[in-house]
Structure formats: C-alpha cells, structure tokens
Amino acid sequence: MLATDLMIPAVADVRGTTITYYDSRDEKDRDDVLVMIHGTSGSTKAHFGFLFPILAAKQRVVSIDWTQPAPNGKPIELDQLVDQVAGAIEEILPGRKAFLLGYSLGAVVTAAVAARRPDLVERLVLVAGWMKTDLQQILRNDVWQALRASGDGAIRAYSTFCAFGGPFLASKTLADLQPGMDAMAFDAFGDQQMELNRRINIVEDVHRISAPTLVIGCTHDQMVPIRHQKALFGAIEDARFAEIPTGHAVVFERPSELTHHIQRFLDEPEAFTAGSIVPTPQP
C-alpha cells in the first residue's frame, strides 16, 4: 500500500472544534493504537511523512493536526492544544487508551496530556521535547521573530541552520537543501506556536506522569538542546532514554533510527526498565 493510500485526512468534532486527523484504521491484530502529535508549524504530512506509513505497517496509527484555537495575532495557550489532543483521542478511540507520541512542541503537549489525563495514555514517547523554556531558546526565538517580522528571506536559511545538526549540514550542499527551504511555509498559526514556545513550563505536569515513557534526545539539537530531554528523563519516574545523533529535525535526518526505537518500545515495552539508557541500534 502506498503512503498516499494511508494518509487520507478525516475530521472529528471536538467540543465544537473541527480537528483534522489521519487514521490507518487497520489494527493489524494488535490492541495498541499509536497516536502521533506533530511539532511547531508542522502537520502530519510535514513531520510524519516517513514515520506514519512505516509504523502503520505493524499497527494502527492515528496522527492529529491541531486547529488554530485563537484568531490571528492573538496568543494561544498550551491548554488549548492539550484539550484538542485529549478530546480527539476520546472521539477517535472511545473507551481506549493510546500509545501517545509527541515531537517537539508536540512532545510538550503529549506530556501534559499524559499527566492530566492518565486514563487516555497507555505509554508515552517524547521526541525532542522540553519542560521549561530557557534563555538559549528565547534568544533563538528572538532572532526568528525579528526575521519573521522583517519579511527577510533569511528566515529560511536560519530555520534550516537551527533545525538540522552540524554533521548533517556539513555533509550536504546548499543545492541539496534548497528545495526544502523553498517549501517552508509561514503562517499566523505557526507564529502563534512560536510565541507559545517562549512560555512553556510543564514542570509540575511532568512529575505527575505515570505512564511508561521513552524519552528520545538528539545529540546536535540547537532548538531544544539535549539537556532538556535528559531533564525529562530524570523527572519522569518510569522513563528510559535513547539518544540519536541528529539535530532537532530527527524526523528528516534519521527517520529509520527513530522508527526503530518507537517500534521496539511498542513491541517490547519491558525490554528496558525505568532508568535505562537504550543502546544505539547496530547494523
């Protein structure tokens, strides 16, 4: 089956808000359903174009796209995105728990869902997430905001520089990266998410997470440095930690390695006990 056959959008009504989601539907004779939440300015197609069809080959996969919860120019709140995800799970998977995965800002949202709605979450994967925004992140955000306000095309180069790891960029040419830079889309909802990123603080939530959790950090991440994922690992009682040698854009740099860690946690949740460091897969 082609990826395009799986990634067909559907809609759910969540307390009067229309939420777009993608559902592979075939449960592959498994009880667990993987629910994925994208990151800042992303979508299912933008962030999970590789992961969705590969993971859907072994179990049912649902991926939820946020709906803009406030008018252009108005701030959005984390609680609004958390409510969208929790409500969508209740609507799409009534009476069931999800294997919940979040990437980047999606990891912040899913961590909060797991803390506040443990009845909805069986297990949790947090990819390149964080608990509390620090000064390094705010300074990077300041530069992004200035470039966005100026309309300078340099925002595409800056976003690429920040998203990918140094070793990955050093192995490419500008011509290799130009199509992706040209395809970047900027809109009001993305601007709202970038502003929200400045105000993240889920420290109290994270300490309440009870679901078995896999935290995945990225060695060369400049957007959410790996110390943040290590802090999540330390704060969640039933957590194990895996590290992938990429920048923040792990879903593009090493999607196969990322998929390996996710699938193993699905297939063998007891393979690594709480507090374990998951080894790098060997060829």
Predicted feature residues:
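Conserved HGGG/HGGXW glycine-rich cap/lid loop of the alpha/beta-hydrolase fold
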Residues: 13-71
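Short alpha-helix in the alpha/beta-hydrolase fold that links the catalytic acid
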Residues: 49, 211, 225-234
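Active-site loop/oxyanion-hole signature of alpha/beta-hydrolase fold enzymes
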Residues: 49, 62-99
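Flexible "cap/lid" loop of the alpha/beta hydrolase fold
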Residues: 111, 115, 123-151
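Conserved alpha/beta-hydrolase catalytic His-Asp/Glu region
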Residues: 135-137, 153-205
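Short beta-strand/loop motif that positions the catalytic acidic residue
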Residues: 209, 215-217, 221
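Acidic catalytic loop of the alpha/beta-hydrolase fold
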Residues: 219-224, 249
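Catalytic histidine-centered segment of alpha/beta-hydrolase-like enzymes
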Residues: 246-260
